[in-house]
Amino acid sequence: MPTAAGHRHIADRILDALPDANFPFADVASDSEYYDAIEFMYRKGYMTGTSETQFSPDSALTKAVLVQALYGMAGSPEVNTDNLSFADLDSSNPAFKAAVWAVSNGIVKASDGKFEPDSEISVADFGLTMIRFSAKVDFNLKRVVKTVSMSFSLALENKFMIIKRSITRAQSAQKLAGYRYY
């Protein structure tokens, strides 16, 4: 005769197998290798979709999305936006505060008064940005060393084609979610 605990175990396994009704992205399969990372980044508010129902996991990560994720991971600190502006990023844009924060902290660069929010992030730039983030904002020697290791791992995974190849939104979600656990 099954026990209450046995019924609970079966019910839990059934619920685990069902897709999360509150997870909005139809293009992220619940059995994909990056589902947990994307769900984590979404639930924490670090990354959003490209629309209400699409995450676009295979699309390239943009500079605006990366700085928004890092800004959120840093706790969304207060930012003085009075002294910095960008010709290509309006102050009403949701990425503006994150861009000012990231440039002010030396995590990413802006040039000639432009932030280039839609520029694609290469694997190499992602690794360097994460090293800067680890060293300047979230300093912990162990984390910095692990971030350097993660960057090298990214280079290996991409067969050292890191200068031209863009990192995808799914790959970045995996690396950023993993970073939180270092």
Predicted segments, located by residue:
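Extracellular/surface recognition and adhesion modules
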Residues: 38-41
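Feature responds to low-complexity, polar/acidic, surface-exposed segments characteristic
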Residues: 19-33, 48-67, 71-97, 104-170, ...
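Histidine-centered active-site loop/cap adjacent to the catalytic His
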Residues: 1-21
